Each structure stands twice: as structure tokens, then as C-alpha cells.
Amino acid sequence: MELDALDRKILEILLKDSRTSYREIAKDLNVAVGTIYNRIKKLEDSGVIQAFTVKLNYESIGYDLTAIIGIKAQGKKIREIERIIAKDKRVTCVYDVTGEYDIIVIAKFRNREDMNRFVKGVLSIDGVEKTNTHVVLEIVKEDFRLEP
């Protein structure tokens, strides 16, 4: 979908705070509330906006450990393995990638024991050949909100 300047401005506002009311957006952009409603509805219907959500501080709710896990898998099993892993609530991202590993997973854990159980569970999935786990020491930037 091609975005015009108004669509982009609406998205920028919603990316900063998805709770911003249509009335506030309309006032900021000097357009009618109905225009904002229609534009946001169009953005939702076309799949540009997939959800209105919050950005959590995971450490504040007990997820103190972030890991990046490379997974080498048998070619025919990759999609199935990705689907299984994606169902785990601790997993934030599953990527099908090129390179030494076939799958990259980013996940949040409460502690090392929780991570250890997860990795051993991944290794028990049929078709997983090996994993390589990197523990994140410090999150410098973690923000998936790209400017439209």
C-alpha cells in the first residue's frame, strides 16, 4: 500500500503513543476527526496497522535475561520448527535467515535456568541439529518502531 504524507503523520503519532485519540490526532494534523477515523480504518484493513499495543520494560516484570539463539535445522523441517518455537510466550522474534544458522530466535527469560530449559526443549525438537546461544549483556537499543 502506498502511504501519503497524512498516513505517515498519523502513523508517526500512533507509534509514539497508540492511545492517542482520533480527536487529538485530528487537532495536531488540522484535519477532521472523520478523516482520521477513515485513514486509520484503511491502514488497519490493508494490514499496515496490525495492532495497537504497548512497549514493556521486560526487566521490570521479571524477564532479566535476553538471548539470541541460532538454530541449525534439517531443511525440510525448518518451517515446522519455526512454528513450534514461535508458539512459546518467551519468544519475541523468530527469523528465517541465511548463513551458518537457519533460524534466529530472540527470547526473554526470567533467569538462566529458564533459558536452559528452553534451549534443551529446542534441541529436543525433531530436525534441530544444533543451537548457538548468545546472552545479551546490555540492551543498547530495542525498538521495532521504524519511522514510516
UniProtKB/Swiss-Prot annotation:
Q: Record's SUPFAM superfamilies?
A: Dimeric alpha+beta barrel (SSF54909), Winged helix' DNA-binding domain (SSF46785)
Instruction: Name the DNA-binding stretches.
Output: 22-41
Matches recorded under Pfam families: AsnC_trans_reg (PF01037), HTH_24 (PF13412)
Q: Does the entry feature the keyword Translocase, yes or no?
A: no
Translocase as a keyword? no
Q: List the disulfide bonds.
A: none
Q: Which GO terms describe its biological process?
A: response to amino acid
PROSITE patterns in the record = HTH_ASNC_2
Tell me where on the tree of life, at the top rank, the source sits: Archaea
Cellular component GO terms, alphabetically? cytosol
Q: Which GO terms describe its molecular function?
A: sequence-specific DNA binding
Q: Which Gene3D superfamilies match?
A: 3.30.70.920, Winged helix-like DNA-binding domain superfamily/Winged helix DNA-binding domain
Q: Which UniProt keywords apply?
A: DNA-binding, Transcription, Transcription regulation
Positions of the HTH asnC-type domain: 3-64
Q: Which InterPro entries match?
A: ArsR-like_HTH, AsnC-type_HTH_dom, Dimeric_a/b-barrel, Tscrpt_reg_AsnC-like, Tscrpt_reg_AsnC/Lrp_C, WH-like_DNA-bd_sf, WH_DNA-bd_sf
Task: Identify this protein by name.
Answer: Uncharacterized HTH-type transcriptional regulator PH1692
Recorded source organism is: Pyrococcus horikoshii (strain ATCC 700860 / DSM 12428 / JCM 9974 / NBRC 100139 / OT-3)
